[in-house]
């Protein structure tokens, strides 16, 4: 029954009344689908008929074709403008085009002005000859005037011919010679006037051409300047947006890295509590320092004692003090040794300068690193070679653990733990860079020998 309804696209009202609301909606949906299907079939059939008609039409023969010109090497002949010695520069070509356009514009203006003057003169002469005649009378007398003028012209031509014939037949007199000389002088004066007028006209034309050329040239320069300034502004805007985006991404990455590293440090048991627990067992008691007599230095010593974190050197501390500090406090902790304490790590270096560390890293390339005893503080410096150059990071060794200088940094029990950790986890300040290749000692040189003696 449904097929019959869809084929006829009709349902009896009594039968429709017996259907539920849901069945009615389904039936209406099916009928709409059938309408769309029939319409699509009709569209496809019309398209096929149109294609058949289009293909059946005879095509016009096209005789046009393109032939490439070939050079002596049997390749397509190519001419790059500006490379040949006889080619004009681009700026000169542009100037010539502008000058030609300005000349044409000036000639056009001069022609329009000349036509305007001719029209004004003709109107003025008409008014002088016929001051009381109206337009209708002038129109009626036009044919008559043309006939009269034609008759006068024919009569004058006949008179001139007769005079010429008489001049040829009769011998020339003194009066004729004087008349001819006078006519010649008049003709020469007329020619001079015409030449002067032409020169003035040419001068005006050249001045107008130069004026138009300068105006167009100035407009073109202003346009080029505005385009250049707009490009520079767009470029600066793009760079500033990139810089802002880079700063935001770096800040976000630093926050994410810190959260991730903190969680990993907690999971690995390398947080400060674990470091303190094991440090209390391994670290021997520090011998008491001798009491100094009260002096002006007490104030500076008290300030250093009160200050937490990394200890900086004052003017009284030198290389010997650093060596003494290392032997008394760091050597018992096996700082710079492997976890078992059997050998010194290849990345460990003694008291070397920043320049010496950069020279060592430069010979090993990107990804190399070393850890050296600082020559300025009682601590260490991690030097790393990246694509942008060498970076140096201070390591705080004032507490019972080791960490990079700053707040909320992960703390490690030993230097070896710190290095091993950052072989798999990047330093936040470096982005995604890892400690990959340890940079060892120079051949035949051991820069930490004075620390182990």
Curated annotation (Swiss-Prot):
Residues 280-301 are annotated as: Disordered. Disulfide bonds: none annotated. InterPro entries: SH2, SH2_dom_sf. Residues 347-439 form the SH2 domain. Residues 96-127 form a coiled coil. GO terms for molecular function: phosphatase binding. SUPFAM superfamilies: SH2 domain. It is found in: Cytoplasm. Inhibits estrogen-induced cell proliferation. This is SH2 domain-containing protein 4A. It comes from Xenopus tropicalis (Western clawed frog).
């Amino acid at each position: 029954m449904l097929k019959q309804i869809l084929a006829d696209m009709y349902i009896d009202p009594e039968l429709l009344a017996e259907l539920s609301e849901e069945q009615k909606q389904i039936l209406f949906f099916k009928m709409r689908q059938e309408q769309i299907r029939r319409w699509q079939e009709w569209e496809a059939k019309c398209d096929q008929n149109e294609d058949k008609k289009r293909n059946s039409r005879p095509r016009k023969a096209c005789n046009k074709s393109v032939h490439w010109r070939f050079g002596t090497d049997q390749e397509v002949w190519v001419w790059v403008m500006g490379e040949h010695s006889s080619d004009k520069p681009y700026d000169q070509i542009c100037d010539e085009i502008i000058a030609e356009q300005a000349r044409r514009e000036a000639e056009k203006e001069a022609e329009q002005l000349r036509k305007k003057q001719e029209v004004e003169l003709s109107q003025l002469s008409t008014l002088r000859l016929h001051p009381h005649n109206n337009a209708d009378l002038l129109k009626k007398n036009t044919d008559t005037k043309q006939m009269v003028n034609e008759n006068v012209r024919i009569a004058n031509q006949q008179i001139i011919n007769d005079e010429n014939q008489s001049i040829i037949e009769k011998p020339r007199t003194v009066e004729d010679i004087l008349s001819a000389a006078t006519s010649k002088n008049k003709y020469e004066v007329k020619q001079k006037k015409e030449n002067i007028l032409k020169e003035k006209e040419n001068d005006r034309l050249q001045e107008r051409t130069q004026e138009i050329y300068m105006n167009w040239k100035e407009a073109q320069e202003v346009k080029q300047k505005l385009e250049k300034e707009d490009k520079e502004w767009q470029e600066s805007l793009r760079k500033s947006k990139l810089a802002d985006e880079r700063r935001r991404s770096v800040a976000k990455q630093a926050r994410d890295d810190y959260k991730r590293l903190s969680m990993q440090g907690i999971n690995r048991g390398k947080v400060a509590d674990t470091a303190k627990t094991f440090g209390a067992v391994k670290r021997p008691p520090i011998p008491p320092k001798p009491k100094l007599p009260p002096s002006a230095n007490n104030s500076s010593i008290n300030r250093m004692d009160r200050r937490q974190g990394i200890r900086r050197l004052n003017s009284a501390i030198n290389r010997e003090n650093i060596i003494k500090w290392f032997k008394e406090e760091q050597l018992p902790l096996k700082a710079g040794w492997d976890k078992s304490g059997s050998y010194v790590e290849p990345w460990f270096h003694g008291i070397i300068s920043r320049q010496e560390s950069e020279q060592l890293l430069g010979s090993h390339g990107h990804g190399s690193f070393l850890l050296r005893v600082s020559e300025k503080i009682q601590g260490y410096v991690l030097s790393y070679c990246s694509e942008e150059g060498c970076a140096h990071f201070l390591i705080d060794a004032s507490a019972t653990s080791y960490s990079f200088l700053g707040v909320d940094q992960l703390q490690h029990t030993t230097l070896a733990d710190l290095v091993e950790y950052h072989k798999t986890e990047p330093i936040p300040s470096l982005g995604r860079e890892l400690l990959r290749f340890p940079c060892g000692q120079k051949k035949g040189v051991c820069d930490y020998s004075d620390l182990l003696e």
